[in-house]
Each structure stands twice: as structure tokens, then as C-alpha cells.
Amino acid sequence: MKIKMNNAVGPQVRTAKPKPSKLLPVLGAASMVGGLQAATQFFAHTFAYHATLGPNVGHVYAPWSILHWTYKWYSQYPDEIMKAGSMGMLVSTVGLLGVAVAKVVTSNSSKANEYLHGSARWAEKKDIQAAGLLPRERNVLEIVTGKAAPTATGVYVGGWQDKDGNFFYLRHSGPEHVLTYAPTRSGKGVGLVVPTLLSWGASSVITDLKGELWALTAGWRQKHAKNKVLRFEPASTSGGVCWNPLDEIRLGTEYEVGDVQNLATLIVDPDGKGLDSHWQKTAFALLVGVILHALYKAKDDGGTATLPSVDAMLADPNRDIGELWMEMATYGHVDGQNHHAIGSAARDMMDRPEEEAGSVLSTAKSYLALYRDPVVARNVSRSDFRIKQLMHEDDPVSLYIVTQPNDKARLRPLVRVMVNMIVRLLADKMDFEGGRPVAHYKHRLLMMLDEFPSLGKLEIMQESLAFVAGYGIKCYLICQDINQLKSRETGYGHDESITSNCHVQNAYPPNRVETAEHLSRLTGQTTVVKEQITTSGRRTAAMLGQVSRTYQEVQRPLLTPDECLRMPGPKKNAQGEIEEAGDMVIYVAGYPAIYGKQPLYFKDPVFSARAAIPAPKVSDRLRAVAQADTEGEGITI
């Protein structure tokens, strides 16, 4: 049995195997027919094409006529028939020998393997359509009925220019997440963020540095996308909404302790580095008890518990701190009985030595110092909306989280609390019908998180990317480079899973080699043919003695790191404003990489008109529900 070598790699594994060539069998059959034709014509020529031989066309007879003549006249003309047969055998033999030689030559010839060292290539239009970033062409039924092909929807992930210079927007409408690498001042806002927010009609959460996105997109989203637009700017008095994180605690249910523990973790770990020190861990335990105590006491007094009130409770100058521990340990929180989590936290503080207890208290108060700012305290004193309303309100809701550059660092703990609660509270349950999940929300939610790593490590975000798409949440994460994401100090570390859970990745020309190397690996390896010319002969001779050319298949990255670094960026004027788009690359899992073109919203008259709609001067406010979501059974002591 002949052993067949397995040279299939890459796409060849899934492609249909080529069928054996039928050329040589056809040539062999033609040789046999040619022999019959030669014998027939030789015999007819011998008898001067006599009419008795039968019908012909220009003295040309059917090839099989010699067989009929042999049966009919062999006894009368044996010599003539033998001569005709010899002529036919000669012609057939020559033809079959030629076929045999061709078979030997083709069998001993090597077959080129264009995927030997890699099969990476740039995507063509059909690849981009298959990836879902371009609308498909109209089918036959749509052409006959005059219907248009489905239009593209979803978020903008880039642009693409065909060979004729036609520009197409690339949009992704699936539930999968998007990760963007774009250095500062590279045009990601005018190319990706603004077009997306000027076309996405469902709910959204937007981190907005300096309020630029609010100014450019809130007007259209409110007036034409029929969104309720909320501006949450904790350090401003300019008419934004207020939000109290403690209103989201599901007080009186079995979830209350977990909710408060999640909140306290974010308070004492503002950078997402983990609770490593003894003081962080003890301050965390203390804050869990104090926050729960403040919630129950405010409920009984008919007031509202807030983070500023928690800070005031710990820093009350007119009350000895020991009185607070005693109150927490004896207060009847639930049905006249003391809450076990609150009492335990108070007894821990009473059992500690005075010096240690003072250090724990000081650590806890230091994490609440942000809420001593009267502006911030006012903006977290009540709730003009609830997290659940982002996806469950009758109208879609757009929440802009606005921070000014000079307040960005100090407000980060509060922003982290909000993002954490959005993910945790909106991805809490899933309904099924007929073995399939069904949407329990009214509107999908887009989380447009610009400068995502600047929020610090949000472990819930990293873990939840794998499943929040099933709850109608689509994340669009933007970072400056791969180092910012993989940093061990401020990011998610080398073994992060953010990139693993983002189906689409796109990138503007990077500034760091590490990002360029990452993009080069994403693009893949390809096979190219290298030509080598060898010459021989005397240097002083008029002509060289011999010139030989050899061809070799070699491997190279489809996009090398230095080529990635040298991708054309956007062209800017003297004022630093972008005038012409640069290049970019887009990666969709399972499809060839796309060498694209950056979109610019101000080059599109539709987007320019939408961006010109003035933003509302005052934020919308939603109807605040009377109590936090109390799903679940009440707890008992």
C-alpha cells in the first residue's frame, strides 16, 4: 500500500481534498481512439475510399469502422486488414508511451505547499462579511422581491477600504466584547467612541474624561435615540444626578452581608491590589459592621444611610468611640435582636488592645476621607436613579460617569464602586424557556469604558467578561497599550483573561514595542517565496558562465513588529487636530486579520449633524424607587 504524506496544515485541514486529475486517463483513451481512427483511414485509403465502405464525411470514417470491416472482409483481404491494424497499433503505442512518460514526470515532481510555514493573510471582503462586520450581499430572493440586504448595526470597530478606494464602516452587533489598543491622542474618540455613541440606541454606561462625550453625544441620544441621559459627576455642582451606593444594598435579605462586603472591599482596596496588609483586612471587617449598622439605624429612624454618614459616625467628636461599639453590639437590628455581623465587628474592636483598635479605626477612616468633600458628599447623599433601571426602565438609559483630570485619581474609588455594582447587580439572574436563555431585561447595555486600566484591577470585571454577554451586557474596553493591561502593579498581570474574553480586538498604530509584538503575533505567520540568483564565471569575462535561480519557501510574520510601529497614523494640522485618518488593524476570532482604515466622525455628514445637537444643560432624573431591590428571602437572627 502506498503511504501518503500528511502535508495538511492550517486551512488545508478543513478544505476539501483535490480530486485526482483526469487528464492522463483521457489522453490514454484518446490514444486508443486515435489508433482505431488511423487503422480505419489507412484501410479506406488502400481501397481509394470506395463507396462500398459506407458513409463518410470528406473521406473521414467513424473510428470503429475498421472493426466492422474486419468482421465483414477479413477472409477476402487479410493482408490489407493486417497492415491497417499495424498502423493503428503504432499510433496507439506512441500515444500511450507519451501518457506513461507524463505520468512518471508528474509523479516524481514535488507539489508546492503554499501553507508550509504559515497561512496568515489579510482579510478580503468575503472574510469581513463572514465575520459579521460588513452586511452580506443581497440574495436571489431579495433581488427578485426588491428588498434591501440587512443593514449593519452595532458598535463601530473600524473601517475598511477596498481596492477601488471605497470606504466601509466595520460594525459588530453580536454580544461579544471588544478590546481596543489606542495610544493617547491617536483619534480613538473621534474614530470609534463617538460614532458608536451616535448610533447605539440601547442603554449605555460611558466613562467620560472631561465631559467631551457628554457634549458630543448626549443631545442626539436624548432627542433622537429616546434615551434618558444621566450625567454623574461626583465633584461637580453643575446639575448632574446623585447616586448613593448604600441604596443598592439589598437590606433585609440574605444578600445584604455579601453586598456590603463587596462594597467594603472596594473602599479599602481603591487600586485593586488586594487586601494584603493586616490593617486593610481589619478595616474591611470593621466597615462591614459599621455600614450595616448605619443602614439598619437609618431605616428605623426614617433617614438615609450614606458613606458620608458612615464616616461621620466613626469620626464623631462629641461621642466616645467605645459608645459606638457598645451600641453596635446591643442594638436590635432585626426583630429586636442584634445582627450577628454587626455585633461581631463591634466585639472585635472591643477585644483589641487600645493601640491596635486605634490603628484599625484610623485606617478605616482614611478610606472614607473622600466623602468629607462637601460636593462629593452631596452627590452621594441620595439616588436619582438605581442601577437596575439602566436595563429595566421603559426607555433606554445612558449614564455618563464624568471625571475631570485633576479629580480622576481621588474619585477612582467611587467610580470603581459604581462599575462593580453595575456588573454585579445587572448580571444576577437568568431565565430559561425551552432549554434556552431568554432576555429578562428591556434594553441591552453597552459599557463603553475608556482608559479601562486606569480604574485599577477590577477582579469582578475580569471574571464576569466570560458570562455577562448572556445577560445583555456588551463591554467595549479601551486601553493605551498591552503593558497597561498586563501590569502587575496597576493592571491585571501577565496571566490576565481580559484579552481571552474579547472576541474582537482592534488597534491603532502603537507606541510601544510590546504592543507591536502582541499585534504581530495576533496577525500570524505567512509563507513567502524567496528567489535566489547564483552566477558563475570569470569576473573579467564579457558574459557570465552560468546563471541559476532557486526558489525557496520561507516564513515571515504577516505584520512584523516594526511594520506595526510604522503603520501610518492620522495626519494632524499645526493645532494638533486630526485632518486625515490613519491605518489600523482589526482582529475577529476565527477570521483573517483586517488591515483597516480609521473612521472619523466629522468626515461623515450624518455623524457631524448628530454631534452638533446640543447636550442638555441639566441631566435627566429617573423615578427613584422607594426601597432597594429586595429580591430574596428576609433574614432572621
Swiss-Prot record:
The chain crosses the membrane at residues 23-43, 85-105. Residues 1-22, 106-637 are cytoplasmic. GO terms for cellular component: plasma membrane. CDD domains: TrwB_TraG_TraD_VirD4. Signal peptide: none annotated. It is found in: Cell inner membrane. It is a multi-pass membrane protein. Keywords: Cell inner membrane, Cell membrane, Conjugation, DNA-binding, Membrane, Plasmid, Transmembrane, Transmembrane helix. The keyword GTP-binding does not apply. Residues 44-84 are periplasmic. It holds the Pfam family T4SS-DNA_transf. GO terms for molecular function: DNA binding. May form multimers of at least 18 subunits. Belongs to the VirD4/TraG family. Required for conjugative transfer of plasmid R751. Binds tightly and specifically to the relaxase TraI. Can also bind to DNA without sequence specificity. May form a pore-like structure that could serve as a channel for DNA transfer. This is Conjugal transfer protein TraG. It comes from Escherichia coli.
